[in-house]
């Protein structure tokens, strides 16, 4: 798939704030703070500043909607697991995400995991929660450029002590080199055509 047009539409907290079009597919991106959600969105759309990136974890505090090719939405969800945020704010982010995931919108959730880290309890809870809600989801391992092939193989072995998956069922992505970009876009196109 070629992304020719990508526009920020709006930020939302409550369901009443979501875009009104229910017929458009939504690809939502969720993961720990600083896992690279905004960088991945910028990589997929080939727009360096579409989704705001920051070295400071916890910058994405709202649900951000981007309309792609006037056909579907990319949705940037708030990150979870950032310790330096007040408990009340964490609770609010959690409720914002819960409302979105529980909404009856046509969506697929991409769960982003940093390949350098074994999945946290929060990552596992997110995956279990998606399964409990019978949500369609895929895992994307980010920051693959930070490890050599040998280190990556070792790390995947460690990750599999906490998470069961086949390498063919997940995506591997680098925002630095755009490795994995085409595979993710092709998968999204398949979902749109089904």
Swiss-Prot record:
Domain EngB-type G: 23-194
Positions with a binding annotation for GTP: 31-38, 58-62, 76-79, 142-145, 173-175
Cofactor(s) of this protein: Mg(2+)
InterPro entries found in the cross-reference section: G_ENGB_dom, GTP-bd, GTP-bd_ribosome_bio_YsxC, P-loop_NTPase
GO MF, one annotated term: metal ion binding
PANTHER family per UniProt: ENGB-TYPE G DOMAIN-CONTAINING PROTEIN, MSS1/TRME-RELATED GTP-BINDING PROTEIN
Family that this chain belongs to: Belongs to the TRAFAC class TrmE-Era-EngA-EngB-Septin-like GTPase superfamily. EngB GTPase family.
UniProt-recorded name of the protein: Probable GTP-binding protein EngB
Species assigned in the record: Fusobacterium nucleatum subsp. nucleatum (strain ATCC 25586 / DSM 15643 / BCRC 10681 / CIP 101130 / JCM 8532 / KCTC 2640 / LMG 13131 / VPI 4355)
Gene that encodes the chain: engB
